[in-house]
Amino acid sequence: MGLIVYYSSATGNTEYFVSQLGQRLFKIDKKKPSVLVDEPYVLVVPTYADGEGRMAVPKVVIRFLNECENRKLIRGVIGGGNRNFGCYYNLASKIIAEKCFVPCLYRFELRGTNEDVICVKKGLERFWKQLV
């Protein structure tokens, strides 16, 4: 199974979600965002946007993806967000998918549900098998 790279803020919603997936995890550290990964991965990222959709992708994630090696190895993105933000719900995953030319594999709200976890586990299993 592939690697999950994720960023989680102080709320811990994304970290909680990925911890339930039973996958190998690599957390993007705010203090060391330029660390390089050396294998294909799926990125799990929350959205942080102002009232107009600006700054949706966390800066630390932008710095991580600006590293050529990291950007080259991304295979898909999963987004976390809050539906209260309407059209900006999961905007970060949409932006990353578009800019990195990878599929947005799934979107979940807040910490996700048990159903979300099951869907993502099954989806990742199929996804990684397709890539091999």
UniProtKB/Swiss-Prot annotation:
GO terms for biological process: protein modification process. Pfam families: Flavodoxin_NdrI. It comes from the Bacteria. InterPro entries: Flavoprotein-like_sf, RNR_Ib_NrdI_bac, RNR_NrdI. Gene3D superfamilies: 3.40.50.360. One of its GO terms (molecular function) is FMN binding. Belongs to the NrdI family. Probably involved in ribonucleotide reductase function. HAMAP family: NrdI. This is Protein NrdI. The gene is nrdI.
